[in-house]
């Protein structure tokens, strides 16, 4: 198991209250031995003018889930910060809920790399993202 911090999904959601994460209604929803999932609705908060899920908000979901996963893989005297994120938007989504799953590609002492897959309710891949995090130490 990769998790060094034993946060429950409820605790992760409480940490996110009164932030951009809660404004977008992102909810941490499931966790496995080496993955973390979150959901986000496709509604008036998350669509662009043409009525599809806004690509920037897919990236916000990817960075949210990847950063929380990274945070749970470090010790109490460490922190993570995003260095780079990219995303390939593969399929438009018009309504419903999307689910993001973050899995680690690399968990090093100074950097982490996470792959995030965002799927629609038909389990079709809509966005594929990669997030690189810097791992720092509190002094």
UniProtKB/Swiss-Prot annotation:
SUPFAM superfamilies the UniProt entry points to: Thioesterase/thiol ester dehydrase-isomerase
One annotated Gene Ontology cellular component of this protein: cytosol
InterPro entries (alphabetical): HotDog_dom_sf, PAAI_dom, Thioestr_dom
Record keywords, A-Z: Hydrolase
GO molecular function: 1,4-dihydroxy-2-naphthoyl-CoA thioesterase activity
EC number assigned by the record: 3.1.2.-
Highest taxon of source: Bacteria
Any Pfam family the entry gives: 4HBT
PANTHER family per UniProt: 1,4-DIHYDROXY-2-NAPHTHOYL-COA THIOESTERASE 1
NCBIfam families: unchar_dom_1 (TIGR00369)
Similarity section: Belongs to the thioesterase PaaI family.
Protein name: Putative esterase PM0788
Species of origin: Pasteurella multocida (strain Pm70)
């Amino acid at each position: 198991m990769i998790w060094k911090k034993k946060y429950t999904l409820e605790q992760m959601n409480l940490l996110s209250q009164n932030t951009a994460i809660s404004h977008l209604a992102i909810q941490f929803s499931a966790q496995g031995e080496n993955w973390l999932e979150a959901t986000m609705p496709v509604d008036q908060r998350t669509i662009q003018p043409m009525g599809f899920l806004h690509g920037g908000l897919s990236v916000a979901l990817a960075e949210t889930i990847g950063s929380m996963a990274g945070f749970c893989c470090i010790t109490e005297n460490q922190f993570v910060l995003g260095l780079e994120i990219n995303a390939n938007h593969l399929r438009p989504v018009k309504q419903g809920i999307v689910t993001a799953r973050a899995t680690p590609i690399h968990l090093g002492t100074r950097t982490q790399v996470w792959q995030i897959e965002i799927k629609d309710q038909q389990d079709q891949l809509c966005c594929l993202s990669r997030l690189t995090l810097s791992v720092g130490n509190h002094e």
